[in-house]
């Protein structure tokens, strides 16, 4: 009867440890985005009925599941447990299928995501010239955002602030040569809406890269777990 390959056994452990680390990173990043004060205020303010944190909550769940599967894979390899390895294989296969389905749906519904993002930000632009308590809270967050990212307004630049421009004037002030002029003041020519869209597009590329790398690890995990499962059964 053939024995269990030590090389395969510890390769399985190593790749599952990487898998567990990936789950930890996804969970940590998703939680950070979820509790980030400035980002939360900017994204969730407004009258949009769409919850922009649905995707973040899904990532928190996915990160937790990946951590559990990584643990099952590591323990199943070290303890040579066929039950743990089978649970790991089934769970990992389901995640890979869901990941591929999510990628296809994400590509198909990208225009819808852009529409939701535009609607949310356009609604928020109205808050800049408003005087309600909700608007004031959003304006404070926008002033911080403008100062940090060197942009002004959301849709129409400094004009979005209306009569509230005096309060936002300092955060919009441009000291370079490539500046726009509004009410006699030099302001940043770039709107925060265009900046947020640029950041969104760049982050999508990063997410795609992470998803591709994770898929490679998942496929290796499936192969190693099934081979190890068969070797343990033939002892």
Swiss-Prot record:
Residues passing through the membrane, by range: 13-33, 53-73, 85-105, 204-224
Main location per the UniProt record: membrane
On the tree of life, the source organism's domain of life is: Eukaryota
List the ranges whose topology is Extracellular. Answer: 34-52, 106-203
Where in the sequence does glycosylation occur per the annotation? 118
Q: What does gene deletion cause?
A: Tspan8 deficiency results in a lower body weight in male mice fed a normal chow diet, and in a lower gain in body weight upon feeding a high fat high carbohydrate diet. No significant body weight differences could be detected for female knockout mice. In addition to the body weight and bone density phenotypes, male knockout mice also exhibit lower circulating levels of free fatty acids and glycerol.
Kindly give the InterPro entries that the UniProt entry links to this protein.
Tetraspanin/Peripherin, Tetraspanin_animals, Tetraspanin_CS, Tetraspanin_EC2_sf
Q: Where in the cell is it found?
A: Cell membrane
Name-wise, this protein is Tetraspanin-8
**Can you name the source organism?**
Mus musculus (Mouse)
Identify the gene encoding this protein. Answer: Tspan8
């Amino acid at each position: 009867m053939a024995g269990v390959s030590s090389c395969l056994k510890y390769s399985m452990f190593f790749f599952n440890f990487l898998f567990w680390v990936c789950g930890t990173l996804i969970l940590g990043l998703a939680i950070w985005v979820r509790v980030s004060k400035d980002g939360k205020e900017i994204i969730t303010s407004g009258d949009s009925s769409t919850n922009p944190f649905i995707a973040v909550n899904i990532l928190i769940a996915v990160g937790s599941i990946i951590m559990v599967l990584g643990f099952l894979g590591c323990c199943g390899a070290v303890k040579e447990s066929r039950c743990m390895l089978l649970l790991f294989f089934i769970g990992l296969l389901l995640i890979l299928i869901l990941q591929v389905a999510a990628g296809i749906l994400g590509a198909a519904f990208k225009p819808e995501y852009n529409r939701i993002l535009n609607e949310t930000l356009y609604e928020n632009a109205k808050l800049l010239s408003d005087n309600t308590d909700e608007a004031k809270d959003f304006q404070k967050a926008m002033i911080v955002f403008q100062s940090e990212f060197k942009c002004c307004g959301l849709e129409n630049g400094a004009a979005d602030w209306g009569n509230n421009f005096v309060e936002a004037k300092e955060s919009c002030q441009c000291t370079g040569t490539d500046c726009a002029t509004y009410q006699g003041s030099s302001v940043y020519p770039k709107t925060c809406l265009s900046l947020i869209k640029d950041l969104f597009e760049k982050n999508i590329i990063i997410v795609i890269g992470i998803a591709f790398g994770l898929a490679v690890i998942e496929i290796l995990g499936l192969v190693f777990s099934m081979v190890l499962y068969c070797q343990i059964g033939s002892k």
